[in-house]
Amino acid sequence: MSNVRSKICGITRLEDALAAVEAGADAIGFVFYAKSPRAVDVRQARAIIAELPPFVTTVGLFVNASRCELNEILEVVPLDLLQFHGDETPADCEGYHRPWIKALRVRPDDDLQAACKHYAGASGILLDAYVPGVPGGTGESFDWSLIPQCLSKPIILAGGLSADNVAEAIRQVRPYAVDVSGGVEQRKGIKDAAKIEAFMRAVRQA
């Protein structure tokens, strides 16, 4: 049985958040990036979070947001963790009085050990597929063999995961956590409770 943590990202509806919690997800993610079909506004996110039970980590995903924009969101939405998915420097990620993770889009020549050292203040590193011009949420997977063993940061594996491949991903990569969005959707922004349950079952059984 796996004790790998899980995050269901791209939540836009309360029923989807509650389905994720019911299935056993450790965290749910809200996308604060207007170009994403899964984007939410502060009122949506705050209303959903207000209905969550305790011990569910709420994560805000940002792509090159200004410090002013991010602070305005944090004044309204009680997020536990920040996820930076753009070209942010370590300095861009600091100073919000919350733990944060940095997403990296993996390419064959990337030095992931060096990236972990570069983002020394991160609580973890999220590894996603590289698709030119798209910061994430593509539904594409990548070659997991590109991930070195024993990276210096907890690894959150993302990119094209679903109930069909997450168990193999866990066996191969041995991540701290897995992150899914498109793999548990009816359509972009709308989750499928049965797919969430199947995904979480596969995670537990890995």
UniProtKB/Swiss-Prot annotation:
Keywords: Amino-acid biosynthesis, Aromatic amino acid biosynthesis, Isomerase, Tryptophan biosynthesis
GO biological process terms on file: L-tryptophan biosynthetic process
Top-level EC class: isomerase
Pathway: Amino-acid biosynthesis; L-tryptophan biosynthesis; L-tryptophan from chorismate: step 3/5
UniProt-recorded Gene Ontology molecular function terms: phosphoribosylanthranilate isomerase activity
InterPro entries: Aldolase_TIM (IPR013785), PRAI_dom (IPR001240), RibuloseP-bd_barrel (IPR011060), TrpF_fam (IPR044643)
EC number: 5.3.1.24
Catalytic activity: N-(5-phospho-beta-D-ribosyl)anthranilate = 1-(2-carboxyphenylamino)-1-deoxy-D-ribulose 5-phosphate
Family label: Belongs to the TrpF family.
HAMAP family with a match to the protein in the record: PRAI (MF_00135)
Name of the protein in question: N-(5'-phosphoribosyl)anthranilate isomerase
Species annotation: Pseudomonas entomophila (strain L48)
Gene this protein is translated from: trpF
